[in-house]
Design a protein with these regions (language model features):
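Metal-dependent nuclease catalytic regions and adjoining charged, substrate-binding loops involved
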Residues: 154, 165-266
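Hydrophobic (often cysteine-bearing) scaffold residues that line and stabilize catalytic clefts
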Residues: 33, 37, 81, 157-160, ...
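A non-catalytic, helix-rich entry segment at domain boundaries
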Residues: 40-110, 114
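Mg2+/Mn2+-dependent nuclease catalytic core
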Residues: 103-210
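Short, compositionally biased low-complexity segments
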Residues: 11-19, 52-69, 169-181
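Nuclease catalytic cores
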Residues: 8-53, 82, 107, 232-235
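Short acidic, Pro/Gly- and aromatic-enriched capping/linker segments at domain boundaries
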Residues: 1-7
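Short amphipathic alpha-helical segments and their helix-coil junctions
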Residues: 15-28, 64-69, 137, 145-146, ...
Length: 266
C-alpha cells in the first residue's frame, strides 16, 4: 500500500472522511475555482523556470476550467483570477529571488520511502532550488489573503513542509505564497526543520498508517460551535444520509481512489 501526506492529513482530520474518500470512492466535485487556479498557476511557474511563456501556459490551462460550472465568491471571476495570475508571475520574475538550476529535473520531484510496516510513502516536491542563495525545498502556494509573518519562523510548524524535509533529508524549506488581491503580492518564507521534527513526523506517519491498516475509521464529530468542521465538510451528506447534499457536493468514482498523486501537478 502506498500513502501520501494528503492521505495522512485527511485521516487525522476525520477517519470517517478518509474512508468515504479513499475506500468508498467518493470525491468532491471540482467546483472550487481557487483549487483549479492553483493547479494551473503551478504549471505556469514550472514553465517560467523552463524559459517557456508562463502567461500562455496559465491561459491555456485556464481555458479548460473557465466554463466548468465553478462557484465563485465575492467579485471573483475566472478572467479576473487569470489577470491576477499574470501579474503575480511578472512580480515573481522581477523579484528574482528564487533559482532552480535544473528546471527540467528539479521540479515536481518524486520521493518514496518504505515504512516500517512495509508500506510505501510518496511525496511530490514542487521544486528543489535556492531562495536568496540558500539551497532549499520549494513549495508554491496560491492564496486570496496574505499569510501571517509573525512570529518569525512560523512556517517551520507547517506539517507539509516538515513532511518534505523528512522525505528529502533537506533541512531548509521555503514557501512562496502568491497572494491574489487588488494589489498582488508574493511572500517568501524560509524555515529550518530540525531532526527532532522529522523523527516526530515519521512516528506520526507510522502510527496513522497502523490505524488505517487496522480499519479504525471512527468519525470526528465537529458540530460544537464555534468549532464546527462538519458544517463545511463536503462529505457531511454521507454522514447525515442526505442524498441531496451528496449529489450537490460529491461524485463517486468506480473502484477505490487511493489519492496517491494528489500533490502531483502534472
Amino acid at each position: 500500500m502506498t500513502y501520501s501526506y494528503t492521505q495522512i492529513s485527511q485521516y487525522l482530520s476525520c477517519p470517517r472522511r478518509y474512508r468515504h474518500r479513499y475506500l468508498d470512492g467518493w470525491q468532491e466535485k471540482d467546483t472550487r475555482p481557487a483549487m483549479l487556479f492553483g493547479r494551473a498557476f503551478e504549471r505556469a511557474v514550472a514553465a517560467l523556470f523552463r524559459r517557456e511563456d508562463p502567461a500562455a501556459v496559465l491561459c491555456e490551462q485556464g481555458s479548460q476550467s473557465k466554463d466548468a460550472g465553478l462557484t465563485y465568491s465575492g467579485s471573483d471571476t475566472w478572467d479576473r483570477m487569470l489577470q491576477q495570475g499574470v501579474q503575480l508571475l511578472e512580480r515573481f520574475a522581477q523579484d528574482g529571488r528564487v533559482r532552480i538550476r535544473r528546471p527540467r529535473t528539479s521540479q515536481q520531484v518524486q520521493f518514496t520511502r518504505v515504512l516500517g510496516s512495509g508500506n510505501s510513502f510518496v511525496s511530490y516536491v514542487d521544486a528543489i532550488g535556492e531562495l536568496d542563495g540558500t539551497p532549499c525545498v520549494l513549495e508554491w502556494k496560491t492564496s486570496s489573503a496574505r499569510y501571517p509573518e509573525e512570529p518569525a519562523g512560523i512556517s517551520a510548524l507547517d506539517p507539509q513542509l516538515v513532511c518534505y524535509s523528512w522525505m528529502t533529508g533537506i533541512d531548509e524549506v521555503a514557501q512562496i505564497v502568491f497572494v491574489r488581491k487588488r494589489l498582488v503580492e508574493v511572500q517568501y518564507f524560509r524555515a529550518t526543520i530540525s531532526e527532532q521534527q522529522r523523527q516526530e513526523f515519521a512516528s506520526l506517519v507510522d502510527d496513522t498508517v497502523r490505524r488505517i491498516d487496522s480499519g479504525w475509521f471512527l468519525p470526528h464529530n465537529g458540530i460544537r460551535f464555534p468549532q464546527n468542521p462538519c458544517t463545511t465538510c463536503p462529505f457531511v451528506g454521507l454522514c447525515l444520509d442526505k442524498s441531496d447534499l451528496v449529489e450537490t457536493a460529491l461524485v463517486r468514482k468506480p473502484g477505490v481512489d487511493l489519492g496517491l498523486f494528489d500533490e502531483l501537478s502534472f
